[in-house]
Amino acid sequence: MAQSQGWVKRYIKAFCKGFFVAVPVAVTFLDRVACVARVEGASMQPSLNPGGSQSSDVVLLNHWKVRNFEVHRGDIVSLVSPKNPEQKIIKRVIALEGDIVRTIGHKNRYVKVPRGHIWVEGDHHGHSFDSNSFGPVSLGLLHAHATHILWPPERWQKLESVLPPERLPVQREEE
């Protein structure tokens, strides 16, 4: 009887040690390196969720790639919504600081993106709440760079940083 209690105590002790090591490592990884997120809505169609409401894509979000605010035109990024800080949104980077962009439905026809900001838009114009609604976005709101579609399996792919030709900045700041 005493021998079986010793085994149980050793098992519980080993489990607790593993738990108290694994949880901080997992939390740090998910917070600082990468995580996954389900994409909802039509704003990024056809790049993400091409099937509409029938299925949601699940993407890999790489926090490491945006740690120094290193983003490029065409990148698909996750950011904190400028209108609702509780919500994260996924959009494509259209313009970087210093670029002049032709807007779609914004109060100004042309906008020069201020220092420390980016211009983001959804691929499905007219179905996207983006910089055309709220203006340039502070780089401080960047959360992660979407790098791959993980789900559904038939859509496994790397997400390319491609800027639609019709959305090229009118004038680019020299890099």
Curated annotation (Swiss-Prot):
Tissue: Expressed in all tissues tested except adult liver and lung.
Keywords, comma-separated and alphabetical: Hydrolase, Membrane, Mitochondrion, Mitochondrion inner membrane, Protease, Transmembrane, Transmembrane helix
Membrane topology: Single-pass membrane protein
Subcellular location: Mitochondrion inner membrane
InterPro entries per UniProt: IMP2, LexA/Signal_pep-like_sf, Pept_S26A_signal_pept_1, Pept_S26A_signal_pept_1_CS, Peptidase_S26
Pfam families named among the record's database cross-references: Peptidase_S26
Residues of the signal peptide: none
Annotated family: Belongs to the peptidase S26 family. IMP2 subfamily.
Protein name: Mitochondrial inner membrane protease subunit 2
Gene expressing this chain: IMMP2L
